[in-house]
UniProtKB/Swiss-Prot annotation:
Its main location: membrane. Belongs to the UPF0182 family. This is UPF0182 protein AF_1421. The chain crosses the membrane at residues 19-41, 61-83, 103-125, 152-174, 195-217, 237-259, 268-290. GO terms for cellular component: extracellular region; plasma membrane. It is a multi-pass membrane protein. The keyword Transmembrane helix applies. Keywords: Cell membrane, Membrane, Transmembrane, Transmembrane helix. It is found in: Cell membrane. Pfam families: UPF0182 (PF03699). HAMAP family: UPF0182.
Length: 880
């Protein structure tokens, strides 16, 4: 009688006590670290008045993490239990996979998707757009707020099941490693094990079918060469194919579960192979052939309705559906009276570009090496009853610029805590030396705008924590050889006690917070001082403009940041920079002294309404008038809109298909490069009243003549977009054509050459297109920078109107030269006129240059030096 075979027992894991202890210690360290981080973060949220926001985030982030943890842990745990049961049934003792492994895999799997917690917040607080997609008739909120969360949850479940399936397969392979063939395995493997595999397979097929079914909704925001959104093939071939494929996968799951339960495991691989082939045929081959042989020969007739969908939904997604179209009745000639009538416009034409004036500000107004002027911004103010555009820059403090020996912990965190004041100049004023006039200047700040709180504790360069209200006074500002000190008098920051000092020492890895004798219970710790990081910590759901600008409001310095609603899956909308929906619903104000943050809604959309549901009381509707005076239409957003509108202004399907009237942003020459014109702010009388607008000239694609200009209003009718179209049959010069005319002007060419030969570098600034009455004025500033000097000087302003070109040392002189011979009834107030015209200076320079060359040839170096000095005097340089 043959004895039954003796099978080896399953693997017994070694004692895990040491491992468990180390895992416990590791877990404890993580828990303590996270607890310290979240508690100190809660203290910060409490200090800025957003404690409820933090608690909402904590609830949703932890809720989402635990949801994902459960999604992964339950299948893994049940699989582990099943493996133990099956191996116990066969061997008499179980194969024990530690449950800590289930916990660890689930924990780290949940960590990988934890940053998607906002999808749950939007899912449960979804708000309708009021716009339904034309294919399925579902509100756009389903695609933007609900579908992403459903896909994450179902995808996580499927991933958990596939991991469980793989673990079960490897566990059983190990437990039955002595089996020599599949037939032997099928014969001896317990039926409960096949049922385990059967259940896992069916659940995996079921979830795969669900994901395939949901994927059909994604066709409405797919990208094609022709349009954005579902095309004819997507709607009529791909969508039905995906439904059919989903049903096939579900039926295959039932069949696979049945045959595995009947011990025919090898059939599963055949089923998967057949499904793969069917999927290729349904989702790639069939759509390709229909597109190639049915649609493309008559593409417009098939795709026309879908092109119309793409146009309409794209315009809605970028807030371009209410653009006002106006004809610009172009007249060739502007006379001097037109200039006089447009005095507010002329007085605010920007002849100082932000790059040259930033260099001027840095050289003349940084005052000390540790102060930094990071950027220059444009805003408008009412000064002496005049509407004035100003260029403003904050004077921030960077401890990195302190001498290396002064970069101590005390200096960086307790003494040098804040910047001081701002610098401001009008956009079109220039001194005799070619430098800007200052309306706010020096330390303490002086000028036409009063600043009562010039300290800047929060800004663009404040990227480290500081402690204020300590026993050590803070450096306030220098005055001559004397340094003035101060104590913080605001309510910004987190009040410290000993316990909090310990917590923040752990958080920052800085023991000095505990050891320093200067820090008391009245001290306040300021962190998240970088303004963009600060607002994104409070409200991480927006994309923030990377160019915050500074404003003086009621004597205080405020930062203003534009917040954008950005989505990637809006139906039928064109994609730009990785997204296909962009709005600017919120303006954020940050106080530079106390760090207070306010979120004001200026143009509500569904994205903000969803956040208002989740975070009641955070978004403010009633913006104070003093704040409203300083909001402006953001340039980055305007650039995106212009890019979209350049194509999607063609609402006629045939014209869009043929690309008959595609526009482009006009190009200009800046220094030696050809670049796209950047949107710029001008003061124009849109409705017989001067107002602050953002504008951009447009040209036909691959051509240089102007076809239209786009304007965004910033004052009373904030956010209104207007397109002014020029007459189709007339040639209106674009910026590059004006640049070419300037290049071809022989007198200017000689002057530029002479300046370059005299040791200076000519910098041609931005060419501005300024609509005046029914014509266009072109203005380009020209700067000089000496080889050794870092300060650019404005030396020339070029103005062009129709066929006329004129220059002057300032805008008013250039305009007088442009309209010389005309006798206006009155004359705009102008700066003191230089004694010599440009033409006279050119003649003098030619004479001096000729004598300089002759002296060099004859070796008369005394005369050479004298002539070189005189050339420098004519150009505005004095001294040797």
């Amino acid at each position: 009688m043959q004895e039954p075979p003796v099978y080896p027992p399953p693997y017994k894991p070694p004692e895990m006590k040491v491992f468990y202890f180390l895992a416990f210690v590791f877990g404890l360290v993580i828990v303590i670290s996270l607890s310290i981080y979240y508690y100190t973060e809660m203290l910060w949220f409490e200090s800025v008045g957003y404690e409820n926001v933090f608690l909402t985030y904590l609830k949703h982030s932890l809720g989402f993490f635990f949801l994902e943890f459960i999604i992964f842990f339950v299948p893994l745990f049940l699989t582990n239990v099943a493996v133990r049961k099956v191996t116990l049934e066969f061997h008499g003792e179980p194969l024990k996979i530690p449950h800590l492994a289930d916990f660890g895999i689930a924990f780290f799997a949940a960590l990988t998707v934890k940053n998607y917690w906002s999808s749950m917040l939007f899912y449960f607080n979804s708000s309708n757009f009021g716009v339904s997609d034309p294919i399925f008739g579902i509100d756009a909120a389903f695609y933007t707020f609900q579908l992403p969360f459903l896909k994450i949850v179902i995808g996580s479940l499927l991933a958990a099941l596939l991991i469980s399936l793989a673990i079960a397969a490897f566990a059983y392979m190990y437990a039955f490693r002595w089996v020599k063939s599949l037939e032997e395995f099928k014969e001896i493997f317990p039926g409960s094990g096949f049922m385990h595999f059967s259940a896992l397979l069916f659940a995996s097929f079921l979830l795969s079918a669900a994901l395939i079914y949901l994927s059909r909704f994604e066709i409405v925001h797919s990208e094609h060469g022709l349009i954005s959104g579902a095309s004819y093939v997507d709607v009529n071939i791909l969508s039905p194919s995906l439904m059919f494929l989903s049903a096939i996968v579900l039926l295959s799951g039932i069949f696979a579960a049945y045959i595995v339960a009947r011990r025919r495991v090898e059939r599963v691989f055949q089923i998967v192979g057949v499904l793969f082939v069917i999927a290729i045929l349904l989702t790639f081959v069939a759509p390709f052939f229909v597109q190639k042989f049915v649609v493309e020969p008559s593409e417009l007739s098939y795709e026309g309705r879908y092109i119309a969908y793409s146009i309409n939904y794209t315009l809605f997604a970028y807030n371009l559906h209410d653009v006002k179209l106006q004809k610009f009745d172009y007249w060739d000639v502007v006379n001097y009276n037109d200039i006089l009538e447009a005095k507010d416009t002329i007085d605010n034409i920007r002849i100082w570009d932000h790059r040259p004036i930033r260099d001027v500000f840095r050289q003349l107004q940084q005052i000390r090496t540790y102060y930094v002027i990071q950027d220059v911004d444009v805003d408008r103010y009412r000064i002496n009853d005049s509407y004035v555009q100003l260029l403003l820059a904050a004077r921030e403090l960077s401890t990195e610029n302190l001498p290396s020996r002064a970069q101590t912990w005390l200096n960086k965190h307790l003494i040098y805590t804040h910047g001081y004041g701002i610098v401001a100049s009008p956009v079109n004023k220039v001194s005799k030396e070619g430098l800007p006039e200052f309306y706010i200047y020096d330390i303490p700040p002086e000028g036409l705008i009063k600043i009562e709180r010039p300290e800047i504790y929060y800004g663009e360069l404040t990227d480290d924590y500081v402690v204020v209200n300590t026993l050590q006074e803070e450096f306030d500002y220098p005055k001559g050889d004397v340094n003035f000190f101060t104590k913080y008098a605001g309510d910004g920051g987190i009040k410290l006690d000993y316990f909090r000092k310990v917590l923040f020492s752990f958080r920052f890895g800085d023991i000095n917070l505990i050891l320093s004798n200067y820090i008391t219970d009245e001290s306040r710790l300021m962190m998240h001082r970088d303004i963009v990081e600060r607002v994104s910590t409070i409200m991480p759901f927006f994309v923030y403009d990377d160019d915050p600008y500074v404003a003086v409001i009621d004597g205080e310095i405020w930062w203003i940041i534009d917040a954008y609603s950005v989505l990637q899956n809006f139906p039928y909308s064109a994609e730009v920079r990785g997204f296909n929906y962009m709005q600017n619903p919120v303006k954020v104000f940050v106080n530079a002294y106390n760090g207070s943050v306010r979120f004001y809604v200026v143009q509500e959309d569904a994205y903000v309404r969803a956040l208002e549901k989740a975070l009641p009381g955070v978004f403010l509707k009633d913006m104070p008038e003093e704040f409203r005076k300083h909001i402006r239409y953001p340039r980055d957003y305007f650039e995106v809109q212009a890019h979209i509108y350049s194509t999607y202004h063609m609402k006629d399907v045939t014209a869009f298909y043929n690309r008959e009237d595609v526009w482009a942003v006009a190009k200009e020459k800046y220094e030696d490069d050809v670049i796209e014109v950047e949107p710029y702010y001008v003061t124009l009388a849109i409705e017989d009243k001067p107002e602050f607008i953002l504008m951009l000239p447009m040209t036909p694609v691959n051509r240089d003549n102007m076809i239209a200009w786009m304007a965004a209003r910033c004052d009373e009718k904030y956010g209104e977009l207007i397109i002014y179209e020029f007459p189709k049959g007339e040639l209106i010069y674009g910026p590059m054509q004006i640049e070419a005319r300037i290049d071809q002007d022989s007198e200017l060419s000689k002057l530029f050459t002479l300046w370059n030969q005299a040791g200076s570098r000519v910098i041609r600034g931005n060419l501005l297109v300024v609509p005046i009455n029914h014509s266009v004025l072109y203005v380009e500033p020209v700067y000089l920078r000496g080889e050794s000097a870092k300060i650019p000087e404005l030396r020339l302003v070029i103005v062009v109107q129709d066929e006329e070109l004129a220059t002057g040392t300032n805008l008013y002189e250039a305009l007088e030269n442009l309209f010389k011979g005309e006798k206006p009834a009155e004359k705009p107030a102008t700066p003191e006129k230089p004694s010599e015209t440009v033409e006279e200076k050119l003649e003098i320079l030619r004479e001096y240059y000729s004598k300089l060359v002759d002296a060099a040839k004859n070796g008369d170096w005394e005369t050479f030096g004298e002539m070189l000095k005189k050339i420098g005097e004519v150009l505005g340089y004095e001294g040797e």
